[in-house]
Amino acid sequence: MIELPAQSIIDSDLYKFSQQAAVLEKYPDVDIEWRWANRDGTPFSNEAVDAIRGNIERMAELKVTNEQIMAFAKACPFFNPSYMAYLKNYRFNPKEVKITQDNDENFAMSIRGKWHSTILWEIPGLFIPSDAYYKIDDTNWSEEGQEALLREKGKFLWNCTFADFGTRRRRNFESQDRAVRILKDNPGFVGTSNVHLALKYGVKPIGTLAHDWIMAHQVLSGIRHCNRAAMQAWNDVYKGNLGIALPDTIGSDSFFADFDGVLSRLFDGTRHDSGCPYEYGEKTIAHYESLGINPCSKVIIFSDGLRANADASPERNPEKIRKYFEGRIKTSFGIGTDFTNDFPGSPALNIVVKPYTVNNIHVVKYPDSAGKAMGDPDAQRVVRYISRGISLDTPLASLKKGK
């Protein structure tokens, strides 16, 4: 048995807790199914899957201490006391998780239950498989040189505002701990998405909402205006706090159609997570200008596969993106895998956990990069038709090839 990679219940991203609190307040009776996806089809050995099963079971042993609750509440005063009381008593329920594997070493995982109960499984549902894979299946790598590599990344980002977003796909806990420890003294470092590490190092927990909040509103309020409904519900809970909107759940054009003058003024900015960052930035600036809003009063957080080195493509290069938009709109960068799973000769897993059904109705993610689409194919066609007017008869595969 390998060591449990989770350090505590709060060894997770802030957005899971902010969404859990919002779900408890707005939608406490909603049922959900989540599914784990292995985008590159990397096989997992029987031994690795057994280790994953064992550590999923051991998650039930975790609890939040009084000291952690007090520190968390102080760092994030937008949480109400009733949510902190809920979190203090929260325990993971491994019965909500189903793991299967076929003879070809195809590993699958699904999670079912109440939305508020299952929502915290997403992050350990990613880093537990990753930890097992790199301890058992892919062992051809070394920690040697990682500190020096991170220091070089920090130098490259010297003029950028950035945060660590590395929890979900980290190689192990040590890799993320090292990243925050080394990068926290960089002048542009603003915090980490990981609450446990934010409290440990006295930096700001970073995060607001993610795709699952908007995906669920496809069922709770309808597909066409799920973005608007999700943002309005979010503001009902947080009253202007945590004001970074996520535009690409069903495509950014659909989002901006819903991002009216009130919401555009209320939210501090948006997060780019798919499609060309330069095209998205131009679209965002034009949107604000059309509403008489100064784009320089808003921010775009870029977070799509960024790499902190000069060899990165223009679409993945934070420094090039920063320079391109300098003086036109504020920029910040959320960097994940490049901080916590960049090991020469040992590629990072490309894995994700997303909702599959809400109240037994399919939901999908169909963003600006079709390769990131998730969900039932027929449901994808429906969302694509409603949000973009594309015929239901158009094959999904042909669109992914750019046709």
Question: What kind of region is each of these model predictions?
Answer:
Residues 2-3, 201, 206-403:
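Glycine-rich phosphate/ribose-binding loops and adjacent secondary-structure elements
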